[in-house]
């Protein structure tokens, strides 16, 4: 699974200059955010930017009676318009997900996986482009694209990552697919971290320490 864990800390403080309304998001730290959790997203409500909590992982209405269906944590940019689950959301149900960085697992020649933390080169908060829906739960899915540059050393996929000044363009775009397809991710850096992050129940700042 691509982009299945990330870290976000002091999200209220870090977004205070861009958010107009905070709908119940607390300024807590989450160093091991994982799918199904209730996590902060930012979306437009008319002309204002609102931050609220949604569950990570879309469950389409057509799958609600399928007991073995796995929530869709990621949405591939290349096939967004081909998938009925996502094609109806891209026009008006776009959001961004604030993050300090995300975890990815690198596989060595023996098939063993080692976790890495990937972040902005200047330690700035960034934002995953995402889609949301209001179904039985409030849910979102992170949009991913082909990895480029040094990130390919870790994984062949990565989130579509926005800088703060790009949020409005994405959320307000009249042609969001053109925006996403022409978008260039910011420069990122990465380093290996300890295996404590493998356990979703672990949630402490030391998860970010280099291995």
Which role fits each region the language model picked out?
Residues 1-211:
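Short linear sequence motif anchored by a di-proline
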